[in-house]
């Protein structure tokens, strides 16, 4: 996982391409809190001099970070650190839309949070060892006061120390990641159809056996480490799931 202590400056002894070493060092400044969300960073020339690399190498590193949504260049104003918890960036992990078309995350109702040894399934999905621990979170998402999604979440406990002491541990992964200095990368989501169990039916106000959509999502950090496994069980009578392909 990227962190502020892993890399301070590029090394001539590394076999990793130089622009990737520079990207790692710059990303570590964001993860470590040295560069705050929405803050302007030094210009390309100053950074190239600081790191002792060419302007082309620095530009390539910054281009990559812009593609990873860590930075945004604004013509005539400079380069700024993106707020990973902003609605604009959080949308990439939220594919549920209301009938009117807008994306919805919904309000969250926490049911339970506990730290426990990782199950075999959690070890497999999160790539953990058998003796690792996870945070397990159960919550319900509501839209306009009505429940539409039950979430079962597992996250590596080592990445989120003291999570149960948070005033609002039901934050979305984009918020938690920013709080804990984790830079999010890609996510993947599997969709399947199931039938509502009696307990699910009661929570979602359905008849037992009603068709439900199961959303199995895995979110990784920039280094490819899995940071959240979430299984959502939902009923979208007046909502829909949208996957954009480009």
Give the predicted meaning of each segment.
Residues 1-53:
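Extreme N-terminal segment that seeds HTH/winged-HTH DNA-binding domains in transcriptional regulators
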Residues 25, 66-67:
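N-terminal leader/targeting segments and the immediate start of mature chains
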Residues 42-43, 78, 190:
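Residue-level "edge-of-site" marker
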Residues 57:
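Residues in the helix-turn-helix
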């Amino acid at each position: 996982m990227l962190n502020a202590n892993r890399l301070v400056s590029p090394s001539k002894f590394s076999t990793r391409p130089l622009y990737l070493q520079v990207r790692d060092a710059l990303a570590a400044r964001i993860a470590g809190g040295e560069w705050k969300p929405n803050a302007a960073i030094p210009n390309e020339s100053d950074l190239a001099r600081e790191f002792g690399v060419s302007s082309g190498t620095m530009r390539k590193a910054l281009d990559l970070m812009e593609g990873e949504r860590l930075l945004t260049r604004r013509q005539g104003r400079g380069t700024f650190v993106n707020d990973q918890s902003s609605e604009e960036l959080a949308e990439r992990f939220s594919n549920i839309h209301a009938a009117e078309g807008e994306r919805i995350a919904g309000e969250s109702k926490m049911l339970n949070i506990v730290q426990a040894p990782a199950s075999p399934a959690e070890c497999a999905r999160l790539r953990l060892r058998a003796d690792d621990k996870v945070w397990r979170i159960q919550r319900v998402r509501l839209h306009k006061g009505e429940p539409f999604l039950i979430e079962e979440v597992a996250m590596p406990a080592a990445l989120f120390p003291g999570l149960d002491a948070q005033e609002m541990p039901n934050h979305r992964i984009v918020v938690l990641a920013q709080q804990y200095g984790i830079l999010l990368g890609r996510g993947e989501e599997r969709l399947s159809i199931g039938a509502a169990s009696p307990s699910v039916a009661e929570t979602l106000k359905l008849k037992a056996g009603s068709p439900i959509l199961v959303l199995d999502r895995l979110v990784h950090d920039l280094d490819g480490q899995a940071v959240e496994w979430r299984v959502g069980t939902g009923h979208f009578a007046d909502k829909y799931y949208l996957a954009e392909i480009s």
